C-alpha cells in the first residue's frame, strides 16, 4: 500500500487556527532578507566582506552593519552559520504557489548560491571552509558541519523537486561530486567514525538524489552513509536510544525511510520499523504525543523525572515526518493519530500565536513557562524546523489510497487528488463552528448569522461536547470507490450522515468505511469529545488532562494537588468561558470542588503565563 498526498499546489487551507498559524509563519519567512540568508555563503566564497562602515559585495556596494545581521547560531563566528537558509529553501519550495514573493526570492537565492559555488571552484558550496570536514575526518572537533550541509542540500533538493528549479539540481549534483571524491578513499571504519558525528539527514538527500538522477555515484553515497553502528544494533533489538541525542537519530532514520522508497530494499524499512518500536510504541510518549527531554530520549516507560525541557521542536517535526512515511506505507490509523497529536500539542503549542516565534522545548512540569526565540538573535535549530513545520499540514487531510480515498486528518482545507476512475476529485473539509467545537477561534458568516438573525437556526445552549466536520467530495466523473474516515482514539462516539441521511457506522482498523458511488456528495461526521485524565506511566498519581485531541494547561505557577477521582475527570473540570461572540471556545475549563481554583486553557494558547500540565491527584477529601 502506498498513499499519495495532494501536491502543495493542490492544497489550500480554509479559515481557522491552522491558516492563521500558516500565515504567521509566512510573515516571518518574508521578514528574513536575502542579504542575511546569503551572507555566510557569500563570505565563504569571497563575495562579501565588511570593514566596519559598509558592506562590499563584488559589483555593488551597499550600506550594512551588525545591527541588521543575523546572530545566535547564524552569527559569523558560529560554526553552525548558514543552516537557516537551507530550511528556508525547503519551506519556500512548498509555498511558492501560495506566495509569488516567496517563490521569486527562493529562485534568487538559488542563483546566488550557484554564483558562490562557482567562486569556490565549481563543487564546494557551504557557509564555512572545507577544513571543517577535514577536521571531522581527522578525529578533531567541529560543530556538526554535515548537519549544516544537510540543511542546504535538502533545501536545494526540495527546490528542485517541489520548487521546479533546475538550477538547484545542478548545484546539488556538483556538490555530490565533492562528497563522492572526499569519501572514496575512506575505509568502512573511517566512514563510520565520520557518521558518528551528527550528519543530519545526509542519507535522505543522497537517496532522493539517486532517485532523480539514477547515477551510480549517488547510489554509492547512499551506501557510504549507511550508519551500521547504529542501524545494526537497532535491528538486533538493543536499546540504542535512551539518553542519546534524539534529533540526530530521527534524521538518520528519515534517510532509511527514503532509501527504502527509492531502492525497495526491505532492510531499510526494517530499520525504520525497529526504530519506531523503540522510540514510540516501546518507549511511550508524553500526553502531547511528543518525546525526548533535554534533547535526549527518556527511558522506556519513565517520564516523571523528565518533565522539564520536553519535546525539542526539531524532534516533533521530524517524528511527524517519520509518521507520515509510515502512514503512507501502511494506511494505519495509529500513525495518523500520532501526527495529529504532535501537530496540535507540538507544532502549534511551540509557535507563539502572535509573534510566530518558536519555543525550543515544551516543559510540562509545575510552574512551567515557554521560552520564545527571537526573530534574528537566536536562530536555534528549531527556528529552521519552525519554517518547515508549517508547510506540513495544508495537504494533510486526505490521500489517494489505490482506487479509494483515505481521510486521516480533519484539517479545514480544499484538496484536489487525481483519481484513476473519478478524474480530479475535490475534497473540502469544513468545521461546523455552530454545532461543534474546533481548535482556535473561528470568525465565520455562519457564526455571525447565528447570533444576529432570529429567523436562522440557533446554536446549542451550552458548548457542544463534540467536533463536527462537513466533507464535500466532488468528482469530475461519477465513480464507485471507497472513502475511509479516520475515527480518532479520543472520540467517545461517532455519527456520520451522507447527503443528510444517517448511516450505520462500520469501523474497520480505525476507519469508517463508505463504499458507494460518488459524484458530488456531502458527508457530515460528528466526533464526541470528553475530558480525560492521562496518568504518568511511572507515577500514576500524576495526571494530565485532554479535551478531545487538545492537551490542557492549568494556569498555575506551583504544584497543586487536585482532590477527586481522575477516572471522573469531568467532575474535576467544568466548562469555563465557553462562548465568545460567534464561536465556541475550545478547551477552556476551571477546577470544581477545590480549595483554590485553577483555570485551564489549551496548551497551544499559552504564551507568557506560568502553567502546569501534570498534576498530582488525590482521592482524599478536601481539607
Label each PLM-derived region with a short phrase.
Residues 5-8, 12-15, 95-107, 156-173, ...:
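Structural helix-adjacent loops and short alpha-helical linkers that scaffold large soluble proteins
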